[in-house]
Amino acid sequence: MGHKGDLKKALDILDTELKKKGISRREAFKLAGLGSASFLMGNTTEAEAATVASASEAKGKILIVGGGLAGISTAARLSNSLSTPDITIIEPNLESVSYQPGQTLVAGGVWDKSDIVYQTKDFIPSGVKMIKDKAKEFDPENNKVITEGGEVISYDYLIVATGLVLDFGMIKGLEGVGTSASANSEISKKIGKNGVHSIYYADGAVNTWTGMQELIKEAKTGKNLKALYTHPNTPIKCGGAPKKIMYLTDARLREAGVRDNVELSFYPNGGTMFGVPEYHDAIVKQFEARDMKWEYKNNLVEIDVNTKKAIFEKRWLEKGVYDEDIEDYEMIPMSKKVERDYDFIHVTPPMRAPDAVKNSSLAWQKGSASKGGWVEVDKETLQHTRYKNVFALGDVAGVPMGKTGGSVRKQYKVLVENLISLMEGKELTSKYAGYTVCPLITGIGTVMLAEFNWTRKPTPSFPLDPSVERYIWWLLKVYALKPMTIYGLLSGKA
């Protein structure tokens, strides 16, 4: 059908759903403050057309490591912005542009895997060279990248967009390291069976839906069951996803009439539901209304898949002796292992940069970001702080927050503008303000659209209370955001 056909189909479905509510698409967009559907179409605005018409004459060999959403979108925008682009992408996965935000919908039985998996070759911009290989070593001192196949690739400018890896092996009892686009055989030995699930890769999302149906079936026998949901002690992509799948489980259990038979419990490593107070407060109220339980400061460290027991490291502070210097009591960090039974557990794995990045001089050398091996870039310009011809964006970039597709939509414009400025010998003036968006699915038919930046304040794009669950955001999530991403962002226009 093609991308435009996919978009038309999505908008037709959107119209049908809106008609059930007695409103038109135009009225819905007006309500949401969108004005028109042009933002979905990926249409080139007059300003963008002018930019393309006056494309930069700057020259240089650009190497992009990573052919996912961030890498290909950046390649497309650079191709549109340079008169004679010389761009190469290194990417080993033939399905690297899978629509990751849809994995929660697959896990909730709303979509199928076929709705989120795409062929990378269909999105490579014209004129861009694609190398099907994996970066093994970065040599920024000599402007080279060495692949696993032994090829040495030189560059004038490097963009690191490798994404991150899912390190299930950091949890005792689980095995393997994978990506959102693919999971190795080690991971599948333990995940996706015996009640242990994870939506963070495509097949895992499929198996989660199967596991959820099995949970419902068992609950219908009258048994009292326990479902656990985790959030690790590392930065993760889409911080709302561990809660989204919990909300969807709640919705499906209610739909089946067996919600009272299953206790749903969330065990995050952190001490809040969300880093933005307004969204934290809203989520707490939603949890209370749904009788979903939670306990902070719990990090999953081990699973026994045979006995269905999860072991958490629980942390807290205890008051010690009085310190006369600070005129307060000393607070002593405490911890202990806590074992919890489960019938169903959703595991959000620890995440980190790929080994090639983590073990290179591109990674942060000190501070909290060094633990995960994230690329050391200026959080505003996305330029490497030590290697000025290197940039990074997306999940692998060592910036606060920013591990969502919505972040990439802001980041890649900043990166392209700054890279071209560098190529032209100009000052880097474009700044990324930390924008992140999380369409937090709270049920079948409701979404809270959480937008924010480094101020940790809501930054809504629309004139509506962002802490309220709305049907219009469900329509946006289910029918509109995918075509905007696939047709708009991946073409460098959204």
Listing of model-derived features with the role each one plays in the protein:
Residues 21-37, 42-59, 131-244, 248, ...:
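FAD-binding core/adjacent interface of flavoenzyme oxidoreductases
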Residues 84, 125-137, 250-371:
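A Rossmann-like FAD-binding core segment of flavoenzymes
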Residues 175-221, 338, 342-407:
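FAD-site-proximal beta/loop scaffold in flavoenzymes
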Residues 1-24:
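N-terminal secretory signal peptides
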Residues 82-155, 277-293:
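N-terminal Rossmann-like dinucleotide/flavin-binding domain of flavoprotein oxidoreductases
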Residues 396-426, 430:
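A conserved FAD-binding loop/helix module that cradles the flavin
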Residues 449-494:
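C-terminal auxiliary extensions adjacent to catalytic cores
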Residues 43-83, 88:
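C-terminal segment of N-terminal export signals and the immediately downstream linker at the start
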